[in-house]
């Protein structure tokens, strides 16, 4: 479960920002998770709760913003929706795809005191 390591890194970033920006508590965390990122949203939710326990973000709401997958098809020169990395282009059936969205995992926003 790599989500635990991802959440540990996320908490480290949040704690560093708390020191740098002088906030005492995190009320909410919004995280963008791409459909092609190989990250399970519910596993992230569980792991964040476990890792944040007893810290600055212990009582924070954990909000997940889903980002749809998209790719540039080199065969038909179009940006197309992509549900999974191994899928062909839905327009031409080609496999020469460059992912342009949906592979991210990012802390989008923090609500702090």
UniProtKB/Swiss-Prot annotation:
Signal peptide: none annotated. Keywords: Metal-binding, Nickel, Zinc. It holds the Pfam family HypA. Zn(2+) binds at residues 73, 76, 89, 92. GO terms for molecular function: nickel cation binding; zinc ion binding. One of its GO terms (biological process) is protein modification process. Gene3D superfamilies: 3.30.2320.80. Ni(2+) binds at residue 2. Belongs to the HypA/HybF family. Involved in the maturation of [NiFe] hydrogenases. Required for nickel insertion into the metal center of the hydrogenase. PANTHER family: HYDROGENASE MATURATION FACTOR HYPA (PTHR34535:SF3). This is Hydrogenase maturation factor HypA. The lineage of its organism: Bacteria, Pseudomonadati, Pseudomonadota, Alphaproteobacteria, Hyphomicrobiales.
